Amino acid sequence: MKVGIIGAMQQEVAILKEAMTNAQTVNKAGCTFYSGQINGVEVVLLQSGIGKVAAAIGTTILLDEYQPDMVLNTGSAGGFDSSLNLGDVVISTEVRHHDADVTAFGYEMGQMAGQPAAFLADEKLMNLAEKALEQMDGQHAVRGLICTGDAFVCTAERQAFIRQHFPSVIAVEMEASAIAQTCYQFKVPFVVVRAISDVADKESPMSFEEFLPLAAKSSSEMVFKMLELLK
């Protein structure tokens, strides 16, 4: 069994990389691939770079060349669910693009031509994430729709647009839908497990940059627990 793990930024993969044994590093097409073992599980850790194009390029190489049996997308996200606070975890049930619009041709908002409106996370991996969560005392999590776009959502106007078209959204970020679409086309199961670094409509004494290391720690701990359960 081989697990693909994807994070966009160095801060989002650093803790996982440090835990790897027998690690080998390959740089290709602007992406960095670390292959080795974490807690006895064979993994390939991808630092893809930020945004949907970078994520799609990296995920394609990961799936084609390393052929993992499953993909976990980790890192940070912006919270949209009112129950979320900084450091909480979100687990995807489905993933959608929030910045795609070909509704003029009869598609749903967020649906790309020739693609499903939503990319569904794997049920077994969602349940695995829930079991991992049970072993993390005090860690709050919400399960639901995660939306992706090539923009850092920080204006009230954009937040309102996303809420209008995707009323069940729990979090937004910048890579997951590209990863999900690539996994869908390769027929590889995936789940997104991210930690909240900022929350819409809630003031925080910490900036995104200040909280990112803590979000990375929370999401990495979830991945560690999931890998332990896979052994």
Curated annotation (Swiss-Prot):
Substrate binds at G78, V153, M174, E175. It comes from the Bacteria. Pathway: Amino-acid biosynthesis; L-methionine biosynthesis via salvage pathway; S-methyl-5-thio-alpha-D-ribose 1-phosphate from S-methyl-5'-thioadenosine (hydrolase route): step 1/2. GO terms for molecular function: adenosylhomocysteine nucleosidase activity; methylthioadenosine nucleosidase activity. CDD domains: MTAN. Belongs to the PNP/UDP phosphorylase family. MtnN subfamily. This is 5'-methylthioadenosine/S-adenosylhomocysteine nucleosidase.
